[in-house]
């Protein structure tokens, strides 16, 4: 499926303006981690473990505004931890919308029904709900029975209230294809606006029992494509080809920048070598050439959209790529 036209136009205008201004590294997405506190303890979440000692810290509305102004990205992904635990999350969403941002609020949706009335529907605002499989699979990974049904109820309430809703699903080594198909069918029947997939990534060198190597990702995504196609998937066709091993893409670690109570996360959304005090320090003082597959061993199996979707625009060198993206945007692919 294609992204909404207004979102693609917002991103395209931003990229064009940045290129005309001679900016070499143009982040497209700001991951704004309001807090690392969470009401779940999911097996695959690196954030709540990495920031275990600072979970009580949270960004203020002013800090969030300043980060959005500094990063100057067209898209802001408000996350955590669980952002619906933050008392000012609705005000932060409104601040982002008033700045012209496309906003995704990433949530496990356990508090979505409770806090839904604090938000107003907007064509640039989406709740992005994390679901890793049908009820039995999702509840096992979250460690709390009933989480799937509570999240589903939150999605249903948000859709009925007129909000945009997307989902994000992490695929682990032991995730059966049938469970993903079951989940996708349920979400499609429910009427979500799009579904994202993310291969499970090891945060340190090598993989553990749950994460996937690059060949395993390609095999899984080929099987998913054969069984499901690209129905309702919220990714560009070029990125999906990359996941299936059908094309190469370079990682753009600066394409998605992350700000949280510790500062600007260096170098990227997944890896943490340091936190720096300013966006300028992140962009100008990071040795970007040192990161990515073939450069840093930790990056060898990473295929996450945070680094590779932003490179799609830069990777379109042929007329066929441009035509394929145009067909996708018009709903023809």
Label for each model-derived stretch:
Residues 2-118, 122-123, 324-325, 329-333:
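Conserved alpha-helical substructure of the radical SAM core
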Residues 49, 80, 131, 199, ...:
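Residues that line or immediately flank small-molecule/substrate-binding pockets and catalytic motifs
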Residues 52, 85, 113, 136, ...:
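Generic structural signal for helix capping and beta-alpha/helix-loop junctions
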Residues 59-60, 99, 123, 128-132, ...:
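Radical SAM enzyme [4Fe-4S]-AdoMet core and its adjacent flexible, acidic
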Residues 109-110, 131-135:
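Short, acidic/turn-prone active-site loops that include or flank metal/cofactor-
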Residues 226-333:
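Accessory C-terminal segments flanking Radical SAM cores
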């Amino acid at each position: 499926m294609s992204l909404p036209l207004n979102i693609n136009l917002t991103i395209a205008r931003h990229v064009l303006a940045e290129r005309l201004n001679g900016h070499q590294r143009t982040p497209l997405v700001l991951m704004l981690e309001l807090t690392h506190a969470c009401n779940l303890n999911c097996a695959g979440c690196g954030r709540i473990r990495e920031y275990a000692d600072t979970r009580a810290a949270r960004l203020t509305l002013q800090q969030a505004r300043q980060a959005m102004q500094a990063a100057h990205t067209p898209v802001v992904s408000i996350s955590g931890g669980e952002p619906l635990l933050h008392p000012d999350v609705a005000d932060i969403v409104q601040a982002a919308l008033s700045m012209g941002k496309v906003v995704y609020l990433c949530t496990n949706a356990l508090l979505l029904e409770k806090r839904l009335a604090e938000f107003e529907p907007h064509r640039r605002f989406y709740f992005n709900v994390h679901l890793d499989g049908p009820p039995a699979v999702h509840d096992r990974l979250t460690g709390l029975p009933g989480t799937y049904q509570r999240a589903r109820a939150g999605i249903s309430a948000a859709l009925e209230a007129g909000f945009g809703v997307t989902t994000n699903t992490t695929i682990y080594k032991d995730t059966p294809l049938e469970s993903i198909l079951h989940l996708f069918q349920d979400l499609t029947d429910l009427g979500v606006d799009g579904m994202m997939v993310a291969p499970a990534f090891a945060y340190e060198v090598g993989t553990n029992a749950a994460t996937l190597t690059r060949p395993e990702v390609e095999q899984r995504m080929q099987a998913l494509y054969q069984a499901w196609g690209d129905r309702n998937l919220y990714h560009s066709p070029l990125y999906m080809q990359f996941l299936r091993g059908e094309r190469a893409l370079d990682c753009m670690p600066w394409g998605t920048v992350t700000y949280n109570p510790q500062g600007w996360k260096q170098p990227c959304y997944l890896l943490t070598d340091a936190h720096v005090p300013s966006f300028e320090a992140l962009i100008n003082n990071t040795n970007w050439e040192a990161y990515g597959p073939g450069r840093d061993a930790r990056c060898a199996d990473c295929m996450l959209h945070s680094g590779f979707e932003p490179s799609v625009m830069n990777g379109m060198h042929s007329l066929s790529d441009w035509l394929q993206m145009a067909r996708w945007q018009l709903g023809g692919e």
